[in-house]
Curated annotation (Swiss-Prot):
One of its GO terms (molecular function) is NAD binding. (S)-2,3,4,5-tetrahydrodipicolinate binds at H125, G134, T135. NAD(+) binds at D33, C68, T69, T70, S92, S93, N94, T95. This is 4-hydroxy-tetrahydrodipicolinate reductase. PANTHER family: 4-HYDROXY-TETRAHYDRODIPICOLINATE REDUCTASE (PTHR20836:SF7), DIHYDRODIPICOLINATE REDUCTASE (PTHR20836). It comes from Brachyspira hyodysenteriae (strain ATCC 49526 / WA1). The gene is dapB.
Length: 231
């Protein structure tokens, strides 16, 4: 399978290194913008501003996509969803196995802890510009879905604020070279349950993206998630 790597940043470089070392896939393009590159799959670790051009290129050339970029808005998400009617797409803010298992865990225990206060804390390196992280947003979404979409998000806190039982607090920390830490904390009366995942290397994201690319081979157009990739 020939892979087009969209983006030339740190994650794209790590993905390139992993693919070359693995030897199963062939890199046919490594760029921020595609012109005449041909390939069987696009793996995207770019910037949300570059997504529209990539999506248009994908549809024009009928190339499936693994989209790992975060920070896009609802308008961009709608474009991705529309594109999935033309080509198969895996959309994931975090392709590592551990985080996707964490999503499953918190979605299962949240209904049993309805009376607990829920907080999400995410920590990343000092070069990450978007906050909260796409992974933290995904954690909120799976918890909210499990709680009948009754919850609402509060990003950080400032000033006088009485906590509502229906709110989930979201907090972003930026510093140093942290690859990515995510915690979901359930605060009850006299007990605390914390589910935490720490990433110690970016290679886990590259490995997950490769797994997603292999999953898409032969798939019909549609929007797929890592839950389906790992099933």
């Amino acid at each position: 399978m020939k892979v087009l790597i969209h983006g030339t940043g740190v994650m794209s470089s790590i993905l390139k290194e992993v693919i070359e070392k693995e030897g199963e896939l062939e890199i046919s393009g490594f760029a921020d913008d595609f012109t005449n590159e041909k390939g069987d799959m696009i793996i995207d670790f770019s910037h949300f501003s570059r997504l529209p051009a990539m999506i248009d290129y994908s549809i024009k050339n009928n190339i499936p996509m693994v989209i790992c970029t975060t920070g896009y808005d609802e308008t961009m998400l709608a474009k991705i969803v529309e594109a999935s009617t033309h080509v198969p797409i895996v959309l994931s803010s975090n392709t590592c196995i551990g985080i996707n298992l964490m999503n499953e865990i918190v979605s299962k225990i949240a209904p049993q802890l309805r009376n607990f206060d829920i907080e999400i804390i995410e920590t990343h390196h000092n070069r990450k510009v978007d906050s909260p992280s796409g992974t933290a947003k995904s954690l909120f979404n799976v918890i909210n879905d499990a709680l009948d979409n009754e919850m609402f998000l509060v990003s950080g806190r400032n000033g006088l604020h009485v906590r509502d039982k229906k709110e989930i607090g979201m907090h972003s920390v930026r510093g140093g070279s942290v690859v990515g830490d995510h915690s979901v904390i359930f605060y009850g009366d006299d007990e605390i349950i914390e589910i935490k995942h720490s990433s110690t290397s970016r290679r886990i994201f590259a490995n997950g993206a490769i797994k997603a690319a292999k999953f898409l081979v032969g798939k019909k157009p549609g929007l797929y998630r890592m839950k389906e990739v790992l099933a």
